[in-house]
Amino acid sequence: MAKHKQEEHPEDVEVKEEAVETAEQAESASPEKSELELANERAEDFENKYLRAHAEMQNIQRRANEERQQLQRYRSQDLAKAILPSIDNLERALAVEGLTDDVKKGLEMVQESLIHALKEEGIEEIPADGAFDHNYHMAIQTVPADDEHPADTIAQVFQKGYKLHDRILRPAMVVVYN
């Protein structure tokens, strides 16, 4: 009877063999396809890593350029801070009574040349007239305000302030009406 069943269904045997072959082909194609997918994923991963590294390098270069520009822009800051007391001393010397005209003229020339050199580097005096601004002025004393002098205005300047571009080197020391 077993032979009879095989003879009756030779088509079933062929169909089963074809199904086995198709399954084997699918299994053999699956690893190839997954290897291809893995290779594509790795390629995408490497591309992403490359793009990130490239962007990071551009950011590093941009930051280095900005830092170099900042250093260039504020290179004279330390020198200016060292020279400002000399300018203050020249102003005090010019305020002394009894100087001969020649000495006074010589001191004024030195003062003007120093101020000119500072201006060429972007260093300028902070205006100390009008309203008090805590960003540029340091109140060291207050005096009562009156009708002629409203509150929060500058009464007197004890020491001039200076700035380098937008950076304060030294705030102006002032007396403020309160």
Swiss-Prot record:
Classification via InterPro entries: GrpE, GrpE_coiled_coil, GrpE_head
Record localization: Cytoplasm
Record-level Gene Ontology MF annotations: adenyl-nucleotide exchange factor activity; protein homodimerization activity; protein-folding chaperone binding; unfolded protein binding
Disulfide bonds: none
Region of interest: Disordered: 1-42
Compositionally biased region (Basic and acidic residues): 1-19, 30-42
GO BP annotations listed: protein folding
Record keywords: Chaperone, Cytoplasm, Stress response
GO cellular component: cytoplasm
Quaternary structure note: Homodimer.
NCBIfam families named in the record: PRK14140.1, PRK14156.1, PRK14162.1
Function of the protein: Participates actively in the response to hyperosmotic and heat shock by preventing the aggregation of stress-denatured proteins, in association with DnaK and GrpE. It is the nucleotide exchange factor for DnaK and may function as a thermosensor. Unfolded proteins bind initially to DnaJ; upon interaction with the DnaJ-bound protein, DnaK hydrolyzes its bound ATP, resulting in the formation of a stable complex. GrpE releases ADP from DnaK; ATP binding to DnaK triggers the release of the substrate protein, thus completing the reaction cycle.
UniProt record similarity statement: Belongs to the GrpE family.
Name of the protein: Protein GrpE
Species for this entry: Streptococcus sanguinis (strain SK36)
